[in-house]
Curated annotation (Swiss-Prot):
Zn(2+) 2 binds at C30, C33, C61, C64. The gene is churc1. Keywords: Activator, Developmental protein, Metal-binding, Transcription, Transcription regulation, Zinc. One of its GO terms (biological process) is positive regulation of DNA-templated transcription. Transcriptional activator that mediates FGF signaling during neural development. Plays a role in the regulation of cell movement. Does not bind DNA by itself. Zn(2+) 3 binds at H59, H71, C88, C91. Zn(2+) 1 binds at C2, C5, C30, H66. This is Protein Churchill. Belongs to the Churchill family. One of its GO terms (molecular function) is zinc ion binding. It comes from Xenopus laevis. The keyword Transcription regulation applies.
Length: 112
């Protein structure tokens, strides 16, 4: 992974978890060839361990094939919530939790 290719390493993305794609606003240019071109997604794998889906891939420079960052995305269901996480030097770090119920109990206002 290369900190010289990005503006900020592991930026906080709040609840934005990317299963695929690249956060190009954080991409400066390839430190190896000094070009700012498309970022390829290579070596993509999907695995499931103990009910957790894990997707990993590499962000790679289109021109010189320099590996910019390694991306990891996870998805799991815990109790009544879908849990998402993302960790990537280019795309950032993020977590999200979404209720599988029609009305999220955490969003309901107290009656009293």
């Amino acid at each position: 992974m290369c900190g010289g290719c990005v503006q900020q390493e592991y930026p906080d993305r709040g609840s934005t978890c990317l299963e695929t794609g690249s956060y190009l606003l954080n991409y400066v240019s390839c430190v190896q060839c000094n070009k700012r071109d498309f970022v390829l997604i290579v070596n993509k794998t999907a695995a499931e361990e103990d009910g957790e889906e894990i997707i990993t891939y590499d962000h790679m420079c289109k021109n010189c094939h320099h590996v910019i960052a390694k991306h990891e995305y996870t998805f799991s269901v815990v109790d009544d919530y879908q849990e998402y996480t993302m960790l990537c030097m280019l795309c950032g770090r993020a977590e999200d939790s979404v209720s599988v119920l029609p009305d999220d109990p955490r969003q309901m206002a107290p009656l009293f």
